[in-house]
């Protein structure tokens, strides 16, 4: 483990298996982290990104505390939904999924989510999946059903249900289920290899010793995780809807293949609601990230909204809440702008400022170390901002203090990823053009035109501050 000033902080994470907070310990360097990525049959919605932002916070926290991390996030490019979409359009699976894969990476960048080390595509690991199925068949853990599909026998895995806390003996099991997604009421043997049906699958299939077909969704993640991280990993994360059946089935398959514990920690984020209701296209409250960006909200505003609540609490997404996040970011932006101003020179940081900064860093670290308690971390941040502003108002602030505070803000932003620093602000070309036109109008003393151009820039979400060195453009 890489050492840092924060590395002595103990990190506690809520493990879904034990239903308790546990001290995080890793014998691996780097930490092995696997997160379930997008199923690329459509554009990802904001509920998906609530999970991805939580996973990003988890990864950033590990890095903040001095761990190195190897992060794998899969791309599910073959399942019931992707196959149905490709067949409906009568195009190849690659042609169907490619635009959604590209959109996913663009969306991730707009939310400032750190990239994974590898994004494996399920379709690139079909041979390894076939090999795993053959092994499970040989060991009598899997069997071929009457429909020629291959199924995993959950009765052959005695601890099945340990993640979702199901007890097989207390439940009425169906014989088998071939769908990728199902609920606990339909508990059954699940599909490892789905036999080809021409009417349903069209031209999409793979050859195997078990006949034409394609792998089951649950097997895909098991194989990609083990191929890229090994038989045992440190952390597996996803949304609560992944607990059953997906993650439960991953455990059964993986541990049957390796005879080792699959993952030591399982973390899951809660659902996102929209105006207090479950997101649904029929209710008209279904949003993709692109919907919100098109309505004028920024990636950092959406990230802040998705980040601000504890990951194990349901998040109620409202437009009013998003506008409140805009104001919170404005407060952060104004503070950074104030800190980046010029102050009296000093050769050292004041003792009060140093104590103030160290106290804040301790409070922030303790908050995120307590199962990623982001609400407490943000409360500590805004208290720090309030106290620092008071110090500046009292004219007890030097350039050394400003540099110290700016360094602290940059350090905590490695966790938050939302603080808008002036140096990071990218002004769109069309805004730059308007600013240049305004400078021409000002040089010609055409004040009416200059004011009109300033208003136009403001309508696009930016302000212009005139200075001797030239105009400074800031995000409103």
UniProtKB/Swiss-Prot annotation:
Cofactor remark? Binds 1 zinc ion per subunit.
Main location group: cytoplasm
- Return the broad EC class: ligase
- InterPro entries tied to this protein: Cys-tRNA-ligase, Cys-tRNA-synt_Ia_DALR, Cys-tRNA/MSH_ligase, CysS_C, Rossmann-like_a/b/a_fold, tRNA-synt_1_cat_dom, tRNAsynth_Ia_anticodon-bd
Where located? Cytoplasm
**UniProt cofactor(s):** Zn(2+)
- Give the catalytic activity: tRNA(Cys) + L-cysteine + ATP = L-cysteinyl-tRNA(Cys) + AMP + diphosphate
Q: Where does Zn(2+) bind?
A: 36, 221, 246, 250
UniProt keywords, alphabetically: Aminoacyl-tRNA synthetase, ATP-binding, Cytoplasm, Ligase, Metal-binding, Nucleotide-binding, Protein biosynthesis, Zinc
Q: Name one GO molecular function term.
A: cysteine-tRNA ligase activity
**GO BP terms:** cysteinyl-tRNA aminoacylation
- GO CC annotations? cytosol
According to the UniProt entry, where does the motif 'HIGH' region sit in this chain?
38-48
Q: Where does ATP bind?
A: 281
Pinpoint motif 'KMSKS' region by residue range: 278-282
UniProt-listed Pfam families: CysS_C, DALR_2, tRNA-synt_1e
The EC number on file is 6.1.1.16
Similarity comment: Belongs to the class-I aminoacyl-tRNA synthetase family.
Please give the subunit comment from the record.
Monomer.
Name it. Answer: Cysteine--tRNA ligase
């Amino acid at each position: 483990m890489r050492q840092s000033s924060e590395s002595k902080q103990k990190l506690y994470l809520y493990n879904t298996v034990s239903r308790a907070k546990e001290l995080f310990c890793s014998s691996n360097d780097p930490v092995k982290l696997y997160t379930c990525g997008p199923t690329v049959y459509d554009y990802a919605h904001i509920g998906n990104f609530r999970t991805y932002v939580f996973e990003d916070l988890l990864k950033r926290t590990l890095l903040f505390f001095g761990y190195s991390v190897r992060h794998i996030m899969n791309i599910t490019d073959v399942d019931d939904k992707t196959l149905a979409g490709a067949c409906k359009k009568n195009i190849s699976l690659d042609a169907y999924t490619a635009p959604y894969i590209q959109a996913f990476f663009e969306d991730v960048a707009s939310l400032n989510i750190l990239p994974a080390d590898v994004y494996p595509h399920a379709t690139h690991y079909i041979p390894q999946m076939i090999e795993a199925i053959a092994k499970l068949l040989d060991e009598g853990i899997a069997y071929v059903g009457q429909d020629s599909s291959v199924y995993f026998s959950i009765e052959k895995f005695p601890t099945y249900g340990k993640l979702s806390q199901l007890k097989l003996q207390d439940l009425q099991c169906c014989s088998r289920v071939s769908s990728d997604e199902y609920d606990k009421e339909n508990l059954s043997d699940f599909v490892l290899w789905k036999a080809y049906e021409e009417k349903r699958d069209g031209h999409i299939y793979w050859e195997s010793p078990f006949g034409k077909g394609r792998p089951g969704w649950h097997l895909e993640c098991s194989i990609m995780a083990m191929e890229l991280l090994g038989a045992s990993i440190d952390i597996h994360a996803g949304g609560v809807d992944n607990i059953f059946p997906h993650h439960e089935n991953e455990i059964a398959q993986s541990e049957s293949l390796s005879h080792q514990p699959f993952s030591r920690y399982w973390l899951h984020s809660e659902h996102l609601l929209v105006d207090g209701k479950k997101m649904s296209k029929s209710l008209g409250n279904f949003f993709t990230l692109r919907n919100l960006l098109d309505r004028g909200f920024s990636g950092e505003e959406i990230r802040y909204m998705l980040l601000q609540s504890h990951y194990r609490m349901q998040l109620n997404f409202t437009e009013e809440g998003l506008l409140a996040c805009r104001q919170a970011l404005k407060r952060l932006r104004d503070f950074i702008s104030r800190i980046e101003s010029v102050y009296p020179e000093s050769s050292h940081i004041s003792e009060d400022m140093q104590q103030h900064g160290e106290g804040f860093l301790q409070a922030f670290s303790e908050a995120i170390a307590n199962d990623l308690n982001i609400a407490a971390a943000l409360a500590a941040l805004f208290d720090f901002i309030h106290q620092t502003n008071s110090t500046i108002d009292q004219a007890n602030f030097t350039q050394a203090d400003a540099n110290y505070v700016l360094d602290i803000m940059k350090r905590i932003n490695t966790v938050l990823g939302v603080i808008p620093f002036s140096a990071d602000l990218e002004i769109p070309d069309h805004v730059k053009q308007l600013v240049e036109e305004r400078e021409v109008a000002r040089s010609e003393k055409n004040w009416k035109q200059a004011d009109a151009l300033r208003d136009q820039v403001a309508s696009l979400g930016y302000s212009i501050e005139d200075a001797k060195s030239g105009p400074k453009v800031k995000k409103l």
